[in-house]
Amino acid sequence: MEALVALLLLAIGVLGYSALQLRAIDASSEALYRSQGMLILRGLADNIRANPLGQSSYPTAVRGYTSIKTAPTAPTVNCYNAAEAQRCTPAQMATYDAYLAEKTAFEIGMHITMDDCPGVSVAPVKRQCLFIAWDDTTLTATATTANISNCMSDAGVYVAGSKCLMMEAY
C-alpha cells in the first residue's frame, strides 16, 4: 500500500515536471518569434529612415504584401542590384524594401503591415507604425488602411493572446 502511494506521488511529480518542460519550450518558441519579428521590423524601419524621399510610399508598399498566401514575387526593378539601383526612384526603393521585409517574414511564418500608430487619429501629423504577426493572429490590409484589430486596440493595448508586435517607424 505504501509503495502505491509513493508511486502515485512520483507520477504526479513527473507529470508536473513534464508540464513545466512543455511550458518552457513554448516560452522559448515565443521568444524566438519576438526576436525575429523585432529584427525584421527594425531593418525595415532603418530602410524607411534611409529613404526620406520615399517615406510616403512605404505604407502602401508594405500593405501590398500583408495578406499574401504564397511567397511574394520580386518587383520588376531590383533596387539592391548595383547596376539597377541608380535607376531606382524613392518609391521603387520603398516597394523593394517592403518586398524584402515581407519575403523574410513570410519564410518564417509571419506577416507585416504598416498603418497609423494607435491613438493618433486626431493628430495633425500621424506617426506610422509597423506591425508583425504570427501563428493565429492575422493582419489584413487594403492599399489605404490596415486592420490590426486582432493585434491591438485603437488605444494601443495588445489583444489578450495575440501574437504580434508593433514598432513605431516614424
Regions found by a protein language model. Give the residues of each.
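Aliphatic-rich helix starts adjacent to a transmembrane/signal segment
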Residues: M1-R42
